[in-house]
UniProtKB/Swiss-Prot annotation:
UniProt PTM comment: Activated by phosphorylation.
GO cellular component, one term: cytosol
Active site: 107
Gene behind this protein: glmM
Classification lineage: Bacteria, Pseudomonadati, Pseudomonadota, Betaproteobacteria, Burkholderiales
Cofactor detail note: Binds 1 Mg(2+) ion per subunit.
UniProt record similarity statement: Belongs to the phosphohexose mutase family.
Biological role: Catalyzes the conversion of glucosamine-6-phosphate to glucosamine-1-phosphate.
Protein's UniProt name: Phosphoglucosamine mutase
Catalyzed reactions: alpha-D-glucosamine 1-phosphate = D-glucosamine 6-phosphate
Membrane-spanning ranges: none
Enzyme Commission number: 5.4.2.10
Gene Ontology biological-process entries: carbohydrate metabolic process; peptidoglycan biosynthetic process; UDP-N-acetylglucosamine biosynthetic process
MF-aspect GO terms: magnesium ion binding; phosphoglucosamine mutase activity; phosphomannomutase activity
Residues that, per the record, bind Mg(2+): 107, 246, 248, 250
Length: 451
């Protein structure tokens, strides 16, 4: 049976609309607390403790209070971290030997959205069976613990400082950032206090932007999903590099001194090349169905195997574990380096990139010399609900014709949206005109067959 509430990245929606309402979130805290209290990992007679962190959305106060009440009613203690990047919650949960971590965030979405995601005691996203158990408890009545069994809540002292030190520990001790001018865009989000300190304490001259959250401006014209602000700031300040995080700081985009933007696909290649230097060999790396073909070809030239996961950092992580590899990424800027952290971390990923540049003595453009991303054309085609696009001979013929024409110099990817009756048509080719032409031909075939 499919999950009713949990998606690939927790539970998310518009604040005030189900399920992101205070009454549901209170019950969610209670349900999660009951699952934790019944876990075999909780010693007899002890009380589970969870950590709650959040980004800077105004709704975070309300949802934090609701979660806290739900956990307390289930007999679970709560530590409150305040504004904290998603990977910071994952780290602190693991480092403090807590039962679970909870993040209140909708990542790169606008302020009127919010969400809840959970981490297990080891700093990983919850397994499917645990999420299913929480959903089962959501169907049961809320029975508050007796007064002597209620959970307690307290603020976690120096949560930010602990995470700052962790981030710095991932940067080679032999290196520092002295002499580098960096623009750090925190998207008015969870890392607004933390990220500038990390880079400053490692010696960089830091120019922070997106560090004035007001509850409503998270991701608004700033951050990893709106990198134009970073490009302008890098050029205006004659900076060496710019780093943009998103609202919960689990992804990044990088801009060089010339104003060129580098996405997760390109940064993955840079990190693999650096790891070959430090480790002598990298067996393989993981991208997604959307990873640019040029990166796959370039990695294979280096003798590195490449596996494509479904879109979503959760699936990249699954493939990394299955193959026993360390490095994976999405073009959106989610980068995983499992020997550094259990989850994607924008700050740590930025430090890995900076370490690679320090080690090589080269710029990003130089490290990517010979890797030219293939142009991509993406068209979203709205269909009639329930339309059988897979069974259409005309759509199949259009796809086959495009693949035959590209013949190894490009690719076609067709994906149905998981939330609306939309078919995503993506064509990648060495020439932009070819990508556009083939994508439009397939899109026309989809429209004719499904609308």
């Amino acid at each position: 049976m499919g999950r009713r509430y949990f998606g690939t990245d927790g539970i998310r929606g518009t604040v005030g609309d189900a399920p992101i309402t205070p009454d549901f979130v209170l019950r969610l805290g209670y349900a999660a607390g009951k699952v934790l209290a019944g876990s075999a990992d909780v010693a007899a007679g002890s009380r589970p403790t969870v950590l709650i962190g959040k980004d800077t959305r105004v709704s975070g106060y309300m949802l934090e209070a609701a979660l806290e009440a739900g956990f307390s009613a289930a007999g679970v203690d709560v530590m409150l971290a305040g504004p904290m990047p998603t990977p910071g919650v994952a780290y602190l949960t693991r480092a403090l030997r807590l039962s679970a971590g909870v993040v209140i965030s909708a990542s790169h979405n606008p302020y009127h959205d919010n969400g809840i995601k959970f981490f297990s005691a080891d700093g990983n996203k919850l397994p499917d069976d645990t999420e299913a158990a929480i959903e089962a408890w959501l169907e049961k009545p809320l029975e508050c613990a007796a007064s002597d069994g209620l959970g307690k809540a307290r603020r976690l002292d120096d949560a930010a400082g602990r995470y700052i030190e962790f981030c710095k520990s991932t940067f080679p001790a032999a290196f520092n950032l002295r002499g580098l001018k960096l623009v750090i865009d925190c998207a008015h989000g969870a890392a607004y206090q933390i990220a500038p300190h990390v880079f400053h304490e490692l010696g960089a001259d830091v120019i922070p932007i997106g560090v004035a959250p007001n509850g409503f401006n998270i991701n608004d014209g700033v951050g990893a999903t709106a990198p134009d602000a970073l490009v302008r700031a890098v050029r205006a300040n004659h900076a060496d590099l710019g780093i943009a995080l998103d609202g919960d700081a689990d992804r990044l985009q990088v801009v060089d001194a010339a104003g060129r933007l580098y996405n997760g696909d390109e940064l993955l290649y840079v990190l693999v090349k650096d790891r070959i230097v430090t480790d002598g060999k990298v067996e393989g790396a993981v991208g997604t169905l959307m990873t640019n073909l040029a990166v796959e070809v370039a990695l294979q030239r280096e003798g590195v195997k490449f596996v494509r996961a479904a879109v979503g950092d959760r699936y990249v992580l699954e493939q990394l574990r299955e193959h026993g590899w360390q490095l994976g990424a999405e073009g959106s800027g989610h980068i995983l380096s499992l020997d550094r952290h259990s989850t994607g971390d924008g700050i740590v990923s930025a430090l890995l990139v900076l370490a690679a540049l320090k080690r090589s003595g080269r710029t990003l453009a130089q490290m990517l010399d010979g890797v030219t991303l293939f142009p991509q054309k993406l068209i979203n085609v709205r269909m009639k609900p329930g339309a059988d696009w897979k069974g259409s001979a005309s759509i199949r013929a259009a796809i086959d014709a495009a693949e035959a024409a590209l013949a190894g110099s490009g690719r076609v990817l067709i994906r149905a949206s998981g939330t609306e009756p939309v078919l995503r048509v993506m064509v990648e080719a060495q020439q932009a005109a070819d990508a556009v032409r083939h994508a439009e031909t397939i899109a026309d075939a989809v429209r004719a067959a499904t609308t």
